[in-house]
Amino acid sequence: MGFTEKQEALVNASYEAFKQNLPGNSVLFYSFILEKAPAAKGMFSFLKDFDEVPQNNPSLQAHAEKVFGLVRDSAAQLRATGVVVLADASLGSVHVQKGVLDPHFVVVKEALLKTLKEAGGATWSDEVSNAWEVAYDELSAAIKKAMS
């Protein structure tokens, strides 16, 4: 069974909940990443010169919005065509340049899900989590393919 209309709607609704507090949720997202992988700090230009995740940082917020938006867009692609095609062909080379490895994708996935759970509150469910996981896994597979 392919990605359903309901799954896409769940992703879209929780993405909107995430965006309602973009500054706070962005800090939360990168805090979760650094909690699991402190060495990843150097991969992000907006983090490498700070001891802690900076508050109200436009670059940090823009990158978080881009990451979550790419996963949301992947859900839409999965619903429409059943496959994820990268709109930005440079994503693979950027990830290679930054030294991203397979374990980093796992850390980001966990941080993304934890952030969405916090943002979604009572609306979070296994069904919402599963929809995001499928979309994220397909996006990360497309990025990894572009990295090789």
From Swiss-Prot:
Domain of life: Eukaryota
Post-translational modification: Nitrated in effective nodules and particularly in hypoxic conditions; this mechanism may play a protective role in the symbiosis by buffering toxic peroxynitrite NO(2)(-). Nitration level decrease during nodule senescence. Phosphorylation at Ser-45 disrupts the molecular environment of its porphyrin ring oxygen binding pocket, thus leading to a reduced oxygen consumption and to the delivery of oxygen O(2) to symbiosomes.
Chain ranges of the Globin domain: 2-148
GO cellular component: cytosol; nucleus
Expression sites (tissue/organ): Stem nodules.
InterPro entries: Globin, Globin-like_sf, Globin/Proto, Leghaemoglobin-like, Leghaemoglobin_Fe_BS
Binding site for O2: 63
Subcellular location: Cytoplasm, Cytosol; Nucleus
GO biological process, one term: nodulation
Molecular function terms from GO: heme binding; metal ion binding; oxygen binding; oxygen carrier activity
Residues where Phosphoserine is found: 45
Keywords: Cytoplasm, Heme, Iron, Metal-binding, Nitration, Nitrogen fixation, Nodulation, Nucleus, Oxygen transport, Phosphoprotein, Transport
Function: Leghemoglobin that reversibly binds oxygen O(2) through a pentacoordinated heme iron. In stem nodules, facilitates the diffusion of oxygen to the bacteroids while preventing the bacterial nitrogenase from being inactivated by buffering dioxygen, nitric oxide and carbon monoxide, and promoting the formation of reactive oxygen species (ROS, e.g. H(2)O(2)). This role is essential for symbiotic nitrogen fixation (SNF).
Assembly description: Monomer.
Similarity field: Belongs to the plant globin family.
UniProt-recorded name of the protein: Leghemoglobin 3
Organism (species): Sesbania rostrata
Organismal lineage: Eukaryota, Viridiplantae, Streptophyta, Embryophyta, Tracheophyta
Gene symbol of the encoding locus: GLB3
